[in-house]
Swiss-Prot record:
The gene is mael. Keywords: Cytoplasm, Developmental protein, Differentiation, DNA-binding, Meiosis, Nucleus, Oogenesis, Repressor, RNA-mediated gene silencing, Transcription, Transcription regulation. This is Protein maelstrom. Belongs to the maelstrom family. Its main location: cytoplasm. In germaria and egg chambers, it is detected in the germline. In the germarium, it is in all regions, including region I where the germ cells are dividing. In early egg chambers, it is uniformly distributed throughout the nurse cells and oocyte but, by stage 5, it is most concentrated around the outer margins of the cells, closest to the periphery of the egg chamber. Level decreases in stages 5 and 6, but most noticeably in the oocyte, where protein level remains. No detectable protein from stage 8 onward (at protein level). Residues 63-78 have a biased composition (Basic and acidic residues). Residues 2-69 bind DNA. It comes from Drosophila melanogaster. SUPFAM superfamilies: HMG-box. It is found in: Cytoplasm; Nucleus; Cytoplasm, Perinuclear region; Cytoplasm, Cytoplasmic ribonucleoprotein granule. Disruption phenotype: Female sterility and defects in karyosome formation and oocyte polarity due to transposable element derepression. Ovary shows mislocalization of 2 proteins involved in the microRNA and/or RNAi pathways, Dicer and AGO2. In testis, transit-amplifying cysts fail to differentiate into primary spermatocytes, instead breaking down into ectopic germline stem cells (GSC) and smaller cysts, due to a depletion of Bag-of-marbles (Bam) protein. Changing residue 291 to A: Reduces nuclear aCCumulation in ovary and ovarian somatic cells. Affects transposable element silencing. Causes female sterility.
Length: 459
């Protein structure tokens, strides 16, 4: 049954009943009968407000009905997600532009955060946190400070122990509750995190943290999990979680603009690809002690935020001519995994046509007596004075009758199927081979005869 529409006359009836005590004592039918005579005497101008009110009521009812079905809810959710994304991008752009306009872009401070979790609810975005790390970073100073802690939530979602065990064993390898490590008081932990973020960004400022786009939902859920037991959370600061990859893109564009460099080739796809390469993934000494001992440094949150800081340094500090400091901009111990060879080193040895990295003297193993950094002249001298002579192993001699040296291609018939004629043919062909390739036939005394030997024996 279609819903009834609001009319201008009924709007007038309802208003008359609300304003007159006599109308409030009447039934709806009596009020309609009484107001009908009054409505007939009213002109178009007097009826106008009531007719307009009836149309507005119909529109409001239709909008309410559409929002109650599935399509209305989906559209609303998509609208909210789009607005949230645009608001996040505008906020990131404003943060970077404000630092640029104040000529302090290299000193702008950003906080990177990462969470590990035990399990996720099947039907909702509820994550049970297991580990947290935050890093304060600026282009000029690199890593300013790191906050890292493990989390013991006390229990995991009922019925998801197997999922939690599988996720833990394939990622961070942290023990599950009730044997979990770290802080057990969620309220205390959340306040410590808020205090750290406030110290990094200043009191009274909005708490903004950055994490990869695919982790934003998980990080927001973990923050909600930690603050749910805090009785004073309504009056506290709200933590905003933004996309670190979009920050990298905007910051790179502005850095190149400040350095007066061409940024036409810089786009979101290029910066995302650079970030996801994770060049410092296997760097030692940047994870917590637990993950260092268990060889799970890749999944350690402390290692994650540190690697992101190194990635920002690697991508932008060179554009601003910022001197990098080991342990802050790059790993404290960096071992080069390459060897520089002069482009014309092979031309110094004219007798060799097979020069390569492995054929050059001393390229494979570094002698202890030689210094690490050698000059170009010393490198040329060592190559020229070497007695190394490359050998050409591409030519060799072999017996054509040896099956092991020349394996048959396909189904080669065995010699036992050829008979006497085939054997004789092979012996004849062997006589045409070079001397050093002929078969050595075993001989006996009967194969040799001496002239006159038989006659002497007879006598």
């Amino acid at each position: 049954m279609a819903p009834k529409k609001h009319s201008g006359f009924m709007m007038f009836v309802n208003e008359w009943r609300n304003r007159n005590a006599e109308g409030r004592r009447m039934t709806l039918a009596q009020a309609v009968s009484h107001c009908g005579t009054i409505w007939e005497k009213m002109n178009t101008q007097q009826r106008g407000p009531y007719n307009s009110g009836g149309k507005d009521a119909n529109v409001a009812q239709r909008a309410k009905r559409e929002s109650s079905n599935g399509h209305g809810q989906v559209d609303k959710a998509q609208r909210e997600a789009t607005e949230s994304l645009m608001d996040m991008k505008r906020t990131i752009e404003r943060l970077v532009l404000n630092a640029k306009m104040s000529h302090d872009l290299e000193n702008a401070k950003f906080v990177f955060v990462a969470f590990n979790y035990f399990t996720k609810a099947l039907t909702t975005d509820v994550y049970v946190p297991a580990e947290f790390a935050a890093c304060e970073y600026s282009l000029k100073e690199g890593i300013r400070s790191i906050y890292s802690t493990m989390i013991d939530p006390g229990q995991i979602i009922f019925g998801q122990g197997s999922d939690a065990l599988l996720h833990s064993s394939t990622t961070h390898d942290l023990p599950l509750p009730p044997n979990a490590l770290g802080e057990k008081n969620m309220t205390k932990l959340y306040r410590n995190i808020v205090d750290y973020l406030s110290k990094c960004q200043g009191k009274g400022k909005t708490l903004v943290v950055f994490t990869p786009a695919e982790n934003i939902t998980m990080v927001k859920s973990c923050f909600r999990y930690l603050e749910c037991d805090d009785d004073f959370r309504d009056g506290g600061e709200k933590i905003q979680v933004f996309d670190i990859q979009y920050l990298l893109f905007i910051l790179k564009k502005e850095v190149m603009n400040v350095a007066d460099l061409n940024d036409e080739k810089i786009n979101k796809f290029a910066t995302d690809a650079f970030f996801k390469k994770d060049f410092f993934e296997f760097t030692a000494g940047i994870a917590c002690q637990y993950h260092e001992d268990n060889d799970r440094t890749k999944y350690c949150t402390q290692s994650m935020v540190t690697r992101w800081a190194y990635t920002f340094t690697d991508f932008m500090c060179g554009d601003l001519a910022i001197t990098v400091q080991p342990g802050k901009h790059i790993p404290a111990q960096t071992k080069p995994n390459y060897l520089i060879i002069s482009s014309y080193a092979s031309s110094l040895d004219h007798e060799s046509s097979f020069d390569s990295f492995y054929s050059l003297p001393g390229s494979g193993v570094k002698k202890e007596s030689q210094p690490e950094a050698c000059s170009l002249s010393s490198s040329r001298l060592s190559v020229a004075s070497s007695s190394y002579k490359p050998i050409d192993h591409t030519s060799f001699a072999a017996n054509l009758n040896e099956v092991s040296e020349f394996p048959s291609l396909g189904m080669r018939n065995s010699s036992k199927h050829h008979g006497i004629a085939a054997s004789a043919q092979r012996e004849w062909n062997a006589r045409n081979l070079p001397t050093h390739s002929r078969l050595i036939r075993k001989v006996s005394d009967n194969d040799f005869s001496v002239n006159g030997a038989d006659g002497k024996l007879k006598k």
